């Protein structure tokens, strides 16, 4: 029978000093011997996705203590990618993921906690906590802050739904009036919560459901809705139950590594492909799999992308649907239900509810279960009132959206595309692969041949796009922005948004060893591996080179001979794999990240071989 980890610091004569300190935190005599459960919060006033989390930790903690555990809350950092976007702050975004993972490990191991409830929400916080959960392998439940309501504004006598990407695109369009931009800016982000489309934050929170590590509804229930409170309360009760099953019944099936198996990672990736999620999810799933000891690779993602159809298009891939619409259509359980009916889900994986994924789908899929209370749960909708308060409204749609022919979620027979929403491309430009979000690419440009225009940084690319250097037919190459080369692997949301602003959204491609925001759409190909700083062929591209992109055949190639490529490589080896004429101040902390970082095909995790 596993011993409580916390017994290390709470039991025995020699731990009198530690117990004295535990007592000073409020522990009573009868608390010693109970599981100590870390409530890992990420409240901050910098991030709308986290601004409402201040009281959530104590909400969960109170429920844990009612159920027989001892709850101790601590906080992690949280970076807002949207606010950090377009300047040097973006260099810190991806490194913050690993810092969060480390900080959770430090706190939990230093204090010998027995289990965790992870209260996350935005882009790097959920992945960082997920990496920590897999690393620590103690009972863990994720409960996120929930999505923001979609923005709405009246323009040209039409009520238009908006999100933050609309504000970015319109602001750079010289033909758009200041008044229109102001109206969009003020309406795009109306409430607390993670940005309202299927951007990185919401994608990752949805994937925790598919992995089995969060409760049904976690990825889609709005932050503002009163029903979300029950997810926090239930997480507090359920984590105590998981502790009992593991520490009292020796049931290891409740541990993150037992839940997050290879099959579970396949389920998560299949969901991601079906919903056209953020390409960042690939990076984070690969990283989490490594922490879990699961051999899940780019080749597996490529294989899944060839058989899993695109069943839903959500903003930024369409203006029609946002996360509130996904929830109305049955949420992630609804999407997984359709994948199950198509024979594309492993139903035997475990979940934090203590049941198999198949059993969970029987209970929570609105197509197979007509229970009135279940449908009421998924009818939870937006109020359309500006607020930073969680659980502040109780509005509901009249009906759920169970239209699997033309609705927000489709069945396989009526799929938006039999091609999945994400694809892996290989070729002489990306020998270890690169990622494109096909759900956000117009099918007319799935095959694209263009002329390279090369930039050594995101900043130069932005100046080139807004300055008119980029023309129709160009492939914009932004290099030395990978995990090592940045360092930090910046998101390229501004370059992709500005291509749309300049009317080039369907007339150009963008290729980078950096990455993209979940808000990106268009022919944007990222995560090119190996990256330029690691000797990748993207570092050998020259202005005027022809680049061929072929999504249906999963290929991307630089149209020069092998001999010319070898000659260029030899020349670059002599010069060194560094950006030409780029002035960028890089802190010591970022240099450390860059030194240890692997390429994107490895999840941009730290290279452990450097420590041997």
Swiss-Prot record:
The modification N6-carboxylysine is found at residue 124. Its EC number is 4.2.1.9. InterPro entries: Dihydro-acid_dehy_C, DihydroxyA_deHydtase, DiOHA_6PGluconate_deHydtase_CS, ILV_EDD_C, ILV_EDD_N, IlvD/EDD_N. The active site is at 517 (proton acceptor). Binds 1 [2Fe-2S] cluster per subunit. This cluster acts as a Lewis acid cofactor. [2Fe-2S] cluster binds at residues 122, 195. Mg(2+) binds at residues 81, 123-124, 491. Gene3D superfamilies: IlvD/EDD C-terminal domain-like (3.50.30.80). SUPFAM superfamilies: IlvD/EDD N-terminal domain-like (SSF143975), LeuD/IlvD-like (SSF52016). GO terms for biological process: isoleucine biosynthetic process; L-valine biosynthetic process. One of its GO terms (cellular component) is cytosol. PROSITE patterns: ILVD_EDD_1 (PS00886), ILVD_EDD_2 (PS00887). One of its GO terms (molecular function) is dihydroxy-acid dehydratase activity. It catalyses: (2R)-2,3-dihydroxy-3-methylbutanoate = 3-methyl-2-oxobutanoate + H2O; (2R,3R)-2,3-dihydroxy-3-methylpentanoate = (S)-3-methyl-2-oxopentanoate + H2O. Its cofactor is [2Fe-2S] cluster; Mg(2+). It holds the Pfam family ILV_EDD_C. Pathway: Amino-acid biosynthesis; L-isoleucine biosynthesis; L-isoleucine from 2-oxobutanoate: step 3/4; Amino-acid biosynthesis; L-valine biosynthesis; L-valine from pyruvate: step 3/4. NCBIfam families: ilvD, PRK12448.1. Functions in the biosynthesis of branched-chain amino acids. Catalyzes the dehydration of (2R,3R)-2,3-dihydroxy-3-methylpentanoate (2,3-dihydroxy-3-methylvalerate) into 2-oxo-3-methylpentanoate (2-oxo-3-methylvalerate) and of (2R)-2,3-dihydroxy-3-methylbutanoate (2,3-dihydroxyisovalerate) into 2-oxo-3-methylbutanoate (2-oxoisovalerate), the penultimate precursor to L-isoleucine and L-valine, respectively. Belongs to the IlvD/Edd family. This is Dihydroxy-acid dehydratase. It comes from Haemophilus influenzae (strain ATCC 51907 / DSM 11121 / KW20 / Rd). The gene is ilvD.
């Amino acid at each position: 029978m596993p011993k409580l980890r916390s017994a290390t610091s709470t039991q025995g004569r020699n731990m009198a000093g530690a117990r004295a300190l535990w007592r000073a935190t409020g522990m009573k005599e009868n608390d010693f011997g109970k599981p100590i459960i870390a409530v890992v919060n990420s409240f901050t006033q910098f991030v709308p996705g986290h601004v409402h989390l201040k009281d959530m930790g104590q909400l969960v903690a109170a429920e844990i203590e009612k159920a027989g555990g001892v709850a101790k809350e601590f906080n992690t950092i949280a970076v807002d990618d949207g606010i950090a976007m377009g300047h040097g702050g973006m260099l810190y975004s991806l490194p913050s993921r690993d810092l969060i993972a480390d900080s959770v490990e430090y706190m939990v191991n230093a204090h010998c906690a027995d289990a965790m409830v992870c209260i996350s929400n935005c882009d790097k916080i959920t992945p960082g906590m997920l990496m920590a959960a897999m690393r620590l392998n103690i009972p863990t439940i994720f409960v996120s802050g929930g999505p923001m309501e979609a923005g709405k504004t009246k323009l040209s006598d039409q009520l238009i739904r908006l999100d933050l990407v609309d504000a970015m695109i319109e602001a750079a369009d010289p033909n758009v009036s200041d008044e229109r931009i102001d109206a969009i800016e003020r309406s795009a982000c109306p409430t607390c919560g993670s940005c309202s489309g299927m951007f990185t934050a919401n994608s990752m929170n949805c994937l925790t459901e598919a992995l089995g590590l969060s409760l049904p509804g976690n990825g889609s229930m709005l932050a503002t809705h009163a029903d979300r409170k029950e997810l926090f309360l239930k997480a507090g009760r359920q984590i105590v139950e998981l502790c009992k099953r593991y520490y009292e019944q020796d049931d290891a099936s409740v541990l993150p590594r037992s839940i997050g198996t290879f099959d579970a990672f396949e389920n998560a990736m299949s969901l991601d492909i079906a919903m056209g999620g953020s390409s960042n999810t690939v990076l984070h799933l690969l990283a989490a799999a490594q922490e879990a000891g699961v051999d899940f690779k780019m080749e597996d993602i490529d294989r899944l992308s060839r058989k899993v159809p695109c069943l839903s298009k959500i903003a930024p891939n369409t203006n029609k649907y946002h996360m509130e619409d996904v929830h109305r259509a049955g949420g992630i359980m609804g999407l997984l239900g359709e994948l199950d009916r198509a024979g594309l889900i492993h139903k035997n994986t475990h979940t934090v509810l203590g049941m198999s994924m198949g059993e969970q789908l029987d209970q929570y899929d609105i197509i197979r279960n007509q229970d009135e209370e279940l449908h009421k749960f998924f009818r939870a909708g937006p109020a359309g009132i500006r607020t930073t308060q969680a659980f502040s409204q109780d509005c509901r749609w009249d009906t759920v959206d169970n239209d699997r022919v033309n609705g927000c979620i489709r069945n396989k027979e009526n799929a938006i595309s039999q091609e999945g929403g994400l694809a892996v491309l290989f070729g002489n430009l990306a020998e270890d692969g690169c990622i494109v979000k096909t759900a956000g690419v117009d099918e007319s440009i799935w095959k694209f041949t263009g002329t390279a225009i090369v930039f050594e940084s995101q900043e130069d690319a932005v100046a080139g796009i807004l300055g008119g250097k980029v023309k129709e037919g160009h492939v914009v190459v932004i290099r030395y922005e990978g995990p090592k080369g940045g360092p930090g692997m910046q998101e390229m949301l501004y370059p992709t948004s500005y291509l749309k602003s300049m009317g080039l959204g369907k007339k150009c491609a963008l290729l980078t060893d950096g990455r993209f925001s979940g808000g990106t759409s268009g022919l944007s190909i990222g995560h090119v591996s190996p990256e330029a700083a690691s000797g990748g062929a993207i570092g050998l591209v020259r202005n005027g080179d022809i680049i061929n992109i072929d999504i249906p055949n999963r290929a991307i190639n630089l149209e020069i001979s092998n001999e010319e490529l070898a000659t260029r490589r030899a020349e670059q080896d002599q010069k060194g794999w560094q950006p030409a004429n780029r002035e960028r101040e890089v802190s010591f902390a970022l240099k450390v990240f860059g030194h240890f970082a692997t390429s994107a095909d490895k999840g941009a995790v730290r290279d452990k071989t450097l420590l041997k």
